[in-house]
C-alpha cells in the first residue's frame, strides 16, 4: 500500500495497521473444536480465531477444526440446531503423533479412522488368577480389571487377590488395610491409618447407623476400620433425635426405614426390583419371618417402612449351631452401603 502525499501521516499509519490486523486475522481465522461427531460435524467449541496449526498442536485425537470465520450467532445455531459445525476437518487422519494417554493406544478402526482404545500394560503382572475390585466385582485377572478402569471406572483398583468373598476368612488385604464385611456379607479391604482432614462445611457431616455424628465420610471409614466391623451410613447430616421417619429427610431416591430395635431411622434404597430366580436362598429376617430371598426381605421392609435385617440364611425354623454363632456376630454388626466406605 502506497500512501498519497496529500494524505495525513496519522491516517496513513492507521490504514497500515488496519491492513496488518486483517492479514493476521485472516491467517488465524478458524474455530477449534474438541471432537468430530458421528454425523461428521464439529462439536464442543474450544476456541475461536485459531489457525489449524495452533488448534491441532495439542496432539489430541478428537480435536477438529473449521475454516469459516463466523459470528457468535452462527456458531450458536450450528451447536444448538444443526448438530455441530459443517465442513469439519479432523486434526488427525492417522495414528502418527497421537497421544491417547496412559493405558490407551491409537489404532485404525474398520472405517480407517484413528481411535484410542484401551490397551493397559499387563506385562509386569505376576498374579494371573482372579482379583476382587473395589467395586465388589470379581475380574478374571488384573488385566481385565485394568481394561474396565480404562473404559469407565478411573478409580477402580484391585483390593485383594482371588474372587470377591462373603467373609473375611482367606482374605489377605495388602499393606496396612483391614478386611471389613458389609451388610450384604461382602468382604472389603479398607485403610485405617489415613489422616482425615477437618470438614470445610457442615454438608460433610454424616450420621452413622450407631447414632454417632461423623465429621466426614473419611472419619466414618476410619471409625469402621478401627472398630473392625461395619458401622454404615444412616443419613447425611448430623444425627438428630428423631421420633419417627417423618423427622428424617432422605436424599438420592432413598426412603427412611425405622429401626424399632434401637429407635432410629435409616435411609435405604428402595428401587431394587427382585428377579424371578429359583436359585436364591431363603433368609430368616429380624422379624422372625422367612423370605424367599434377601431381595424379597428388602422389598417387604420398603413396603412397610420398618427396617429388616438378615438373621441367618435359610428358613427361620432351621437354625444350626453354626448359624447361631454367625447370628451373635451379626447382631453386633451395623449394616452399611459400600458407598459409605469406599466411594465417598
Swiss-Prot record:
**Cross-referenced PROSITE patterns, in alphabetical order?**
KAZAL_2 (PS51465), TB (PS51364)
Organism this protein belongs to: Mus musculus (Mouse)
UniProt keyword rRNA-binding, yes or no: no
Signal sequence span is 1-29
Q: What else is known?
A: Induces muscle hypertrophy when injected into the tibialis anterior muscle with reduced response in older mice.
Query: What is the protein's given name?
Result: Follistatin
Q: Where is the TB domain?
A: 30-103
Q: In the record, what lineage is assigned to the organism producing the protein? A: Eukaryota, Metazoa, Chordata, Craniata, Vertebrata
Superkingdom, according to UniProt?
Eukaryota
Task: Return the SMART domains for the record.
Answer: FOLN (SM00274), KAZAL (SM00280)
A Pfam family cross-referenced in the UniProt record is FOLN
Amino acid at each position: 500500500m502506497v500512501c498519497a502525499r496529500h494524505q495525513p501521516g496519522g491516517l496513513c499509519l492507521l490504514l497500515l495497521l488496519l491492513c496488518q490486523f486483517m492479514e493476521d486475522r485472516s491467517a488465524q481465522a478458524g474455530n477449534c473444536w474438541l471432537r468430530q461427531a458421528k454425523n461428521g460435524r464439529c462439536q464442543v467449541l474450544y476456541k475461536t480465531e485459531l489457525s489449524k496449526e495452533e488448534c491441532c498442536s495439542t496432539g489430541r485425537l478428537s480435536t477438529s477444526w473449521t475454516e469459516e470465520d463466523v459470528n457468535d450467532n452462527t456458531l450458536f445455531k450450528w451447536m444448538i440446531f444443526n448438530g455441530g459445525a459443517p465442513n469439519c476437518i479432523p486434526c488427525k487422519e492417522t495414528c502418527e503423533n497421537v497421544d491417547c494417554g496412559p493405558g490407551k493406544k491409537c489404532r485404525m478402526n474398520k472405517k480407517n479412522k484413528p481411535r484410542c482404545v484401551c490397551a493397559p500394560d499387563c506385562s509386569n503382572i505376576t498374579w494371573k488368577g482372579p482379583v476382587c475390585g473395589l467395586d465388589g466385582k470379581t475380574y478374571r485377572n488384573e488385566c481385565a480389571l485394568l481394561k474396565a478402569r480404562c473404559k469407565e471406572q478411573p478409580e477402580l483398583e484391585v483390593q485383594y487377590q482371588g474372587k470377591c468373598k462373603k467373609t473375611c476368612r482367606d482374605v489377605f488385604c495388602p499393606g496396612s488395610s483391614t478386611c471389613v464385611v458389609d451388610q450384604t456379607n461382602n468382604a472389603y479391604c479398607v485403610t485405617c491409618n489415613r489422616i482425615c482432614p477437618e470438614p470445610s462445611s457442615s454438608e460433610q457431616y454424616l450420621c452413622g447407623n450407631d447414632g454417632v455424628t461423623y465429621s466426614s465420610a473419611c472419619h466414618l471409614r476410619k471409625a469402621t476400620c478401627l472398630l473392625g466391623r461395619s458401622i454404615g451410613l444412616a443419613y447425611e447430616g448430623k444425627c438428630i433425635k428423631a421420633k419417627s421417619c417423618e423427622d428424617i429427610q432422605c436424599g438420592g431416591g432413598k426412603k427412611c426405614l425405622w429401626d424399632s430395635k434401637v429407635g432410629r431411622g435409616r435411609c435405604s434404597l428402595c428401587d431394587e426390583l427382585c428377579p424371578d430366580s429359583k436359585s436364591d436362598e431363603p433368609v430368616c429376617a429380624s422379624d422372625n419371618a422367612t423370605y424367599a430371598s434377601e431381595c424379597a426381605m428388602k422389598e417387604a421392609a420398603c413396603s412397610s417402612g420398618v427396617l429388616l435385617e438378615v438373621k441367618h440364611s435359610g428358613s427361620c425354623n432351621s437354625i444350626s449351631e453354626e448359624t447361631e454363632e454367625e447370628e451373635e456376630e451379626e447382631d453386633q454388626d451395623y449394616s452399611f452401603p459400600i458407598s459409605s466406605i469406599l466411594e465417598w
